[in-house]
Each structure stands twice: as structure tokens, then as C-alpha cells.
């Protein structure tokens, strides 16, 4: 019998690994086209995966944005029927024209079941960790 919590964690790990490797295509493949994104680093809601892809491409082109590493801790999965809420603390190293930045943030990714044992993300929310020291 499938373990939905393990499946969600595997889907989250795939997404986090792709982001940490700056693997744009694999990262965005984790999200449905209708996914929404709320980041403390952007002024408004990114109302689709395409909107986040365009913002990613802009950051790469204009600021030399590149993810160097991403680590997930304090992980939690809440299952509500065919939906799962994954929350964690995420430590990210990235670089841009401003130099290397280490971010300490809290993130929630909401998944929905897509097939018998597959989960796809349809919402991501990122906020600074309250006890973070950002450099």
C-alpha cells in the first residue's frame, strides 16, 4: 500500500534538489501550469508557473542569478484528502551580481495528487525565517 507522506516527501525532495542544482527545467516540472507563487522577494503574486519562469529568466539575465545549494530541515507534511501541505525551513545559497547570498527562509509547498502515487505542486509560499540572519 502506498504511503502518501513518503510520496509527498519524495516529490518535495525532487523539487528541492532541482532548485538547489539550479536545474530550471526539473524544478519547474515539479509545478502544475496553474501553480501560484508568493515570495517575500517579489512585489506581488506570481499567478502561474509561466509567470515564475519569466521572473526566473529575468533574474538570470539581468542579475546573473544562480542557485548554488539548498538544504531542507524541520519538515512537516499534512495530508487533507487529495491535497498535501509540505512545510519546512530552507537554507539557500545563491549568487548574483550582488555576490553570494545565504537565505534562511520558511517555505510551504502545497501538492495535489496527480495519478495514483504522484504528487504535483500547485502553490509555493516563501517567507523569511523569523530568527534568520541573512547575509
Which ranges hold each PLM region?
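Beta-strand-connecting loop/turn residues
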Residues: 33, 82, 116-117
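C-terminal-biased regions
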Residues: 3-4, 64, 70, 84, ...
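Short, low-complexity N-terminal intrinsically disordered segments enriched in polar/charged residues
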Residues: 1-33, 51, 132-135
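Short, cysteine-centered beta-strand-loop-beta hairpins and adjacent loop/turn segments enriched
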Residues: 93-101
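Hydrophobic/aromatic beta-strand elements that line small-molecule binding cavities or substrate pockets
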Residues: 15, 56, 72-77, 89-92, ...
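Short beta-strand edge/turn micro-motifs at domain boundaries
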Residues: 102-134
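A solvent-exposed, acidic/Ser-Thr-rich amphipathic alpha-helical stretch
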Residues: 24-79, 89, 101-102
Amino acid at each position: 500500500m502506498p504511503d502518501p507522506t513518503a510520496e509527498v516527501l519524495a516529490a518535495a525532495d525532487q523539487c528541492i534538489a532541482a532548485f538547489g542544482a539550479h536545474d530550471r527545467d526539473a524544478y519547474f516540472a515539479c509545478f502544475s501550469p496553474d501553480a501560484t507563487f508568493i515570495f517575500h522577494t517579489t512585489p506581488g503574486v506570481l499567478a502561474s508557473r509561466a509567470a515564475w519562469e519569466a521572473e526566473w529568466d529575468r533574474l538570470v539575465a539581468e542579475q546573473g542569478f544562480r542557485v548554488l545549494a539548498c538544504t531542507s530541515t524541520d519538515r512537516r507534511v499534512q495530508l487533507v484528502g487529495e491535497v498535501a501541505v509540505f512545510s519546512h525551513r530552507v537554507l539557500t545559497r545563491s549568487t548574483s551580481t550582488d555576490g553570494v547570498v545565504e537565505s534562511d527562509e520558511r517555505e510551504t509547498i502545497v501538492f495535489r495528487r496527480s495519478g495514483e502515487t504522484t504528487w504535483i505542486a500547485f502553490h509555493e509560499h516563501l517567507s523569511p525565517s523569523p530568527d534568520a540572519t541573512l547575509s
